[in-house]
Design a protein with these regions (language model features):
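Active-site neighborhoods and metal-handling regions in enzymes and metal-associated proteins
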Residues: 1-376
Length: 376
């Protein structure tokens, strides 16, 4: 019946002076409950955690799946449907009536996520407007997301499996690609390959950016055809076991130009310097600045233009981030990307991205694909 994440949740709630927690972010709900294969993007689910009970409020479409997933857990499923705010207000009144709590304002603190929509917050206010017992709403800052930043072994195993698919897809796509293909043709083959290899879905919409398009870090694949001398940036990932992978490789069509080789070497050096230095206690800001320093030393100061990396998990972008703004020390169990890049508008772009986990004495890289410049 144990749920270690639920126990951690309650410990953190107590430490922050929060009695109940109203959780609507679907990735947070998935993480807290540890239910697999149940939740989708529908806004049909609420996890409501109190000091002694934990509920999932959903509707009839998810009743059977939630019932199966909750067996041998402490979660109570209520698939009655309806508005989450009204349901919580009713439960709240029943709890405090049974406990003999004196009627009044702010009888306890109810944590709400900083990502909750204003519309739903107004619904909560209305639901409690005439109630005999009213909570004090306590807005939190990444309350569950910060807990999600430290991964357990089951999560790490899922991400290693997702990355194995991604590595295999890269091995295939470099054999498939040829001069004259469009970016969209390469993208379709890449994504179909990940699915054929066992991906449950894509971690995100894949990037295939050739030639000058590669200078836009989030370029959208189009009808541009691969040309001799092009650098081609490919950023892609699979989803397996409910978790994401993320990698980027930049390859060259035909013989690489001297500039392409110079850029690639600088980006590779930055990537490998950071991966060698990551360990507990070092900050995301320090890792970002290290990459910037390596690029600057190679003549590409100010040519990255984005943060060095981000957390990965249920979502493709999680905490912690490797950015100049993050002075929080890294912890064992943090999973992050390392993705330095150089972008020269009108010419080329290059990015090299791995991801892995912070360990007791360093950084375990999940990505196994080569760091050598691959020639198509």
């Amino acid at each position: 019946m144990a749920n270690s994440r639920l126990e951690r949740m309650r410990e953190n709630m107590s430490a922050c002076g929060i009695d109940d927690f109203y959780c609507r972010d679907i990735s947070n709900v998935q993480w807290i409950t540890e239910f697999e294969g149940v939740f989708d993007d529908e806004p049909a689910h609420l996890a409501f955690v109190t000091p002694k009970k934990a509920f999932v409020h959903t509707d009839s479409r998810y009743a059977d799946a939630c019932d199966r997933a909750s067996r041998h857990t402490l979660w109570i499923i209520d698939a009655c449907g309806g508005a989450h705010a009204a349901w919580v207000a009713k439960k709240f009144a029943a709890f405090h009536a049974a406990a003999g709590t004196p009627e009044g304002e702010s009888v306890c603190a109810m944590g709400i996520e900083d990502s909750i929509e204003l519309r739903e917050f107004r619904e909560l206010e209305r639901a409690f407007s005439e109630a005999k017992w009213k909570p004090r709403f306590a807005e939190t800052d990444g309350f569950v997301k910060k807990m999600r930043a430290v991964k357990d072994e089951r999560e790490l195993s899922a991400m290693r499996a997702a990355q194995a698919i991604t590595d295999a897809a890269f091995e295939h796509i470099v054999e498939f690609m040829s001069e004259g293909m469009t970016e969209l043709e390469v993208k379709r083959e890449l994504e179909e390959t990940m699915r054929r290899l066992g991906a449950e879905g894509l971690a995100f919409d894949s990037i295939v950016a050739s030639g000058p398009n590669g200078a836009a870090p989030h370029s959208i694949a189009g009808e541009r055809r691969l040309q001799a001398g092009d650098m081609v940036v490919m950023d892609f990932g699979a989803r397996k076991g409910g978790y994401c992978s993320d990698m980027t490789r930049t390859v060259c069509v035909g013989e690489a130009t001297p500039l392409a080789r110079e850029v690639f070497a600088a980006v590779r050096e930055a990537n490998e310097a950071v991966e060698a230095m990551i360990r507990p206690g070092r900050t995301g800001a320090a890792m970002h600045h290290l990459a910037e320093d390596v690029l600057a030393h190679n003549g590409f100061a100010g040519k990255m233009g984005h943060g060095l990396g981000h957390g990965v998990g249920i979502d493709i972008h999680e905490l912690p981030v490797l950015s100049p703004r993050n002075e929080t020390p890294l912890e064992v169990g943090n999973v992050v990307t390392v993705e330095p890049g150089v972008y020269l508008p009108g010419e080329i772009g290059c990015r090299l991205e791995d991801f892995g986990v912070v360990t007791e004495d360093g950084f375990e890289v999940f990505t196994k694909s080569t760091h050598e410049l691959v020639i198509i």
